[in-house]
């Protein structure tokens, strides 16, 4: 869960996903401290106000995000019969966001009551859900970026990929995300500390620090390097294609689909990078020079950012699919006009289609698949983009 019940002492913090408990000096076991009891003090009016505000904000985010993602799923169901890859991936992203948002009521209930009421199974499921959906989302975005890269630079390779192949890729992202989340799911357990119930990991602080560092690499660093490299190469390819396209057709390609995918990726990083830095800071710095009030504010902000990502995403998904449909219609019109003018500067595109027809593939049943993966602009005949 993204929301952490922060410590009000300077003791070393052991972070469980988003829940923070304290490790007392001289005690090898994690034990309850003022992370639970502090905010319940009657004199802590600020804490009560802060709890009410964060509860209201998260509730609003949950409602908006759930409505938006359900709407996205309903709309996408109309296009799933098409062979276009984007619809499969957008459905996967919306499902991940929806699952993540479903944990909001449990977070609010836990923070208001200052206790855990959902048992050992709730610990294992809810405290692993954010890692699961986080990885499923970023892995899907990485695949989407690689698909767009292939559609621009290797169109024939992408045409040969069926919708079933892409569904297997999506299933693979969830299986890999589940594999990375499995250690947390197995290690977390319900522990009684006095009159309170806490979800704590069975392993020690060092193992937990190592595990969180690994997940930071798999959810932020690794995908970031891959996506960054893909977009650097795409930027170079678009720069070259713009030069050639201007000379040949006086038209520049329209990379709006790529821009929107990149926007979703950047939003993911903007929302989850502060969360991860906050978590790792607690792991690698035993005593942070922050007052309890400051730590609480930082925790609230990082929490709202992570859930804000799933709240804003549906609006970007709508823009993405709208521009994607326009792009497909534009490519179909371009193919239709080019087929009547084989000697025109844009005749490279239908020649690719003829290659597929000569190889025995029928494009009549998958014209949308073919137009999706053809290049956004004519390729120079000297192969400069390859």
From Swiss-Prot:
Positions on the Cytoplasmic side per record topology: 78-87, 147-167, 233-258, 322-386
Domain of life: Eukaryota
Signal sequence coordinates: none
Main location as per UniProt: membrane
Segments passing through the bilayer: 55-77, 88-113, 125-146, 168-186, 210-232, 259-284, 300-321
Single annotated GO MF: urotensin II receptor activity
Lineage: Eukaryota, Metazoa, Chordata, Craniata, Vertebrata
Pfam family for this entry, one: 7tm_1
Organism: Rattus norvegicus
Gene name per UniProt: Uts2r
Job of this protein: High affinity receptor for urotensin-2 and urotensin-2B. The activity of this receptor is mediated by a G-protein that activate a phosphatidylinositol-calcium second messenger system.
Positions of disulphide bridges: 123-199
InterPro entries listed in its UniProt record: GPCR_Rhodpsn (IPR000276), GPCR_Rhodpsn_7TM (IPR017452), Urot_II_rcpt (IPR000670)
Extracellular side: 1-54, 114-124, 187-209, 285-299
Family from the record: Belongs to the G-protein coupled receptor 1 family.
Name of the protein in question: Urotensin-2 receptor
Cell compartment(s), UniProt: Cell membrane
Bilayer topology annotation: Multi-pass membrane protein
GO CC annotation: early endosome; plasma membrane; recycling endosome
UniProt entry keywords in alphabetical sequence: Cell membrane, Disulfide bond, G-protein coupled receptor, Glycoprotein, Membrane, Receptor, Transducer, Transmembrane, Transmembrane helix
GO biological process, one term: positive regulation of fibroblast proliferation
Tissue: Preferentially expressed in neural and sensory tissues.
Annotated glycan sites: 29, 33
